[in-house]
């Protein structure tokens, strides 16, 4: 049914008593990833990319190109350079097409205030207002303009010869690995068959075929001859499942790896590297399922000395993910005991000094400095493909926890001083506190006229009487149960269940033997 347009006088009308607060579970969470646009990142893209290896490096560079227009060209070029070390021809073609489209889209629209070399680098159109030519500078400009694009063209132009060569090599290697696996199966050597499946899966992974790689890694399970082989198979499946973002599969194989006899019975020191890898994978899966407190505990259990798997996650990621989730969900005691006083996680925080300062300032109740530092690292977090969809939620939880901790010792608080402490306006702060009161996180009332927040005074006398009555009822119930048990023991009364045949008999026998009588009285119940 078509919607009729509103009259011009009613389009800007606002109904009275309208509360300007968005519903908490609207489509904002589902579309958050699509709305991310990062304008001012402060990361060194080369250093960032070198923390990872394999497909995860390509995925992260592609994500940077998606959300950050400033780094898009550089990220795509780095991804193209790296993908040429693999057999992933399809991804090379996709990346090159995106780079070509990006360059074609940027060339006709140079910045309005660009001048000098930037203006000369853009391809002039027939309608462009060109200044008078500088005859003396033309030979130099032409030489520079011819030399620089030549190098760039050689490095990032579409290489059809490389595509054909890689496709042929990939096909030959696949045929060889497949024939080797058939020979191993004909010889019925389990260890060789297991290795053959792993080699075939590694090749599929290099070609970017994640589905077939997952199938081959999973098939190796039937040919594992030791617990170590089972754990290795589980780790491979977990790795590919993370690439596919199948988090339920990740958690399932983490449980299988932890229940392997050799891993469960072995010492924690002997399996420290595998344990750390499983904890990081579990933390990543719980983070994506928005179980932030569980994710924080998994990341905090990681061992810094054994955290070396760039094909999945970096040590800096462990610090950032674990630190932010802990800030958003831990109380002061947990934050002190599990994060600040943790000798293991302290090594992770050394890699992220800004995050370390944020945690310490939050614990010291310096909320203005803490929130300012959080805003400074926000853009860098938004270029991380795993934490970016959760940044808004985590920041909101951290801010709400800071408000709760700030107000908890007081019976009343001046909202003007609170607004100064949180770098906010009084109106915005009042809306935040109102939402916390509605959610039941703060027991308080707002004096909107004087801008004062009053804590609700609980009647200690009534609450004490209520607790006393509840405890009295519990004691009475326990006492009656004890008296009944003592009477049954004194009368030699006990209940014997009858074996059920075919599931039709649900009865039991109550045997009562009084005194020294040898005859038992049976009653059917």
UniProtKB/Swiss-Prot annotation:
GO terms for biological process: female germ-line stem cell population maintenance; germ cell development; germarium-derived cystoblast division; male germ-line cyst encapsulation; protein stabilization. Residues 298-460 form the PCI domain. PROSITE patterns: PCI. Gene3D superfamilies: 1.25.40.570. It comes from the Eukaryota. Disulfide bonds: none annotated. Its main location: cytoplasm. SUPFAM superfamilies: Winged helix' DNA-binding domain. It is found in: Cytoplasm; Nucleus. Keywords: Cytoplasm, Developmental protein, Differentiation, Nucleus, Oogenesis, Signalosome. GO terms for cellular component: COP9 signalosome; cytoplasm. It holds the Pfam family CSN1_C. Belongs to the CSN1 family. Essential component of the COP9 signalosome complex (CSN), a complex involved in various cellular and developmental processes. The CSN complex is an essential regulator of the ubiquitin (Ubl) conjugation pathway by mediating the deneddylation of the cullin subunits of the SCF-type E3 ligase complexes, leading to decrease the Ubl ligase activity of SCF. The CSN complex plays an essential role in oogenesis and embryogenesis and is required for proper photoreceptor R cell differentiation and promote lamina glial cell migration or axon targeting. Component of the CSN complex, probably composed of CSN1b, alien/CSN2, CSN3, CSN4, CSN5, CSN6, CSN7 and CSN8. PANTHER family: 26S PROTESOME SUBUNIT 6 (PTHR14145), COP9 SIGNALOSOME COMPLEX SUBUNIT 1 (PTHR14145:SF2). This is COP9 signalosome complex subunit 1b. The gene is CSN1b.
